[in-house]
Each structure stands twice: as structure tokens, then as C-alpha cells.
Regions:
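An N-terminal alpha-helical hairpin/helix-loop-helix interaction module that forms a charged
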Residues: 1-126, 141-163
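Contiguous, well-ordered alpha-helical segments that form the cores/surfaces of helical PPI scaffolds
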Residues: 133-140
Length: 163
């Protein structure tokens, strides 16, 4: 028995679902996320991992705040407010943590957990949700760090029989 993408029935099902979804979005006009495709390229041009420093971390966080629209946001505003407060309180640490997110010699989960752990040592109540990290990384490089909704990703991988 073939499973996952090797199963012709699954492949045809996914093709039809993708087509129907695209048609629905075009016809209904309900797809209100075009802003993401406009905001991320602009952020990618403004932000550079190599340029992260304690001296400019406030400006970087402000750029992230401004790039996160009021409606249909990438990340809840409270996470950006907390990141702003962290950068004001501990600019050196914040710059170090932000650079650490892009250290690909370590697994992504470890990088995010290290960021959270060290930030909570300074601000125990800081809110640093998963969407914040996805947004930060996509803001620096939207090609390398794609944004996707975790629930949708998990459902698709389950459907395809991918662990």
C-alpha cells in the first residue's frame, strides 16, 4: 500500500484542495493576508543579522514593531511590547539573543528556548510566543524562514503520514 505523497489518491486530493482553496480566496475576497507579502520584503531590506548590535537593537525592535500591522498581525502586540522593554532594559543581552536565533550550528528549538530562558532571567513575566520568533526570523530572511500556521502544518503532515 502506498502512503503519503506516493499515494496517487492523496496527491490528487491535495491538488484539488489547493485549487479549490485558491479559487475560494480569489472569489470571496476574504484572503486578507496580502500585507504579509508586502511587509516582509521591506523588513528583509531594512534588517541584517550581521548588523545587530547593542547600539542599534532599539532601532531594530522598533522596525519590527512598525512592520507588524495593527490588523491581521504577524504577532500579538504584547510580545513586541515585551521585546521592546527587554531591549531598553538589556540592550547587549537582547542583541546577543537576537543574533543567537540565527546561529544555525544549533537546532532551532534550542535557539528559541535559550532566548526565552535568558530573557526570563531578566524579565520573568516576558511574553515570547512562537509567532514572535517566526516573525523575527522571517523579518530578517523570509526565504530561509518561512511563516506558516503550526496547526495547518501538523494537519497536513498527519494527512500525509509524515512523522
Amino acid at each position: 500500500m502506498t502512503t503519503g505523497l506516493s499515494n496517487p489518491a492523496v496527491r490528487e486530493y491535495l491538488r484539488v484542495v489547493a485549487l479549490e482553496y485558491a479559487l475560494f480566496r480569489q472569489e470571496s475576497g476574504e484572503w486578507l493576508e496580502q500585507y504579509k507579502f508586502e511587509a516582509l520584503p521591506s523588513l528583509n531590506q531594512q534588517l541584517d543579522v550581521a548588523g545587530i548590535s547593542a547600539e542599534n537593537i532599539g532601532k531594530i525592535v522598533e522596525t519590527l514593531r512598525k512592520g507588524n500591522p495593527q490588523r491581521g498581525t504577524f504577532v500579538h502586540f504584547t510580545n513586541i511590547v515585551d521585546l521592546t522593554n527587554l531591549s531598553a532594559k538589556e540592550p547587549q543581552l537582547t542583541a546577543e539573543l537576537l543574533r543567537g536565533l540565527f546561529d544555525e550550528s544549533r537546532p532551532l528549538a534550542a535557539r528559541i528556548e535559550a532566548f526565552r530562558d535568558r530573557a526570563r532571567q531578566v524579565m520573568p513575566e516576558i511574553r515570547l510566543g512562537t509567532p514572535l520568533f517566526g516573525y523575527i526570523m522571517a523579518a530578517f530572511d523570509m526565504v530561509r524562514y518561512l511563516l506558516y500556521k503550526d496547526e495547518t502544518f501538523r494537519r497536513i503532515t498527519s494527512l500525509l503520514g509524515i512523522e
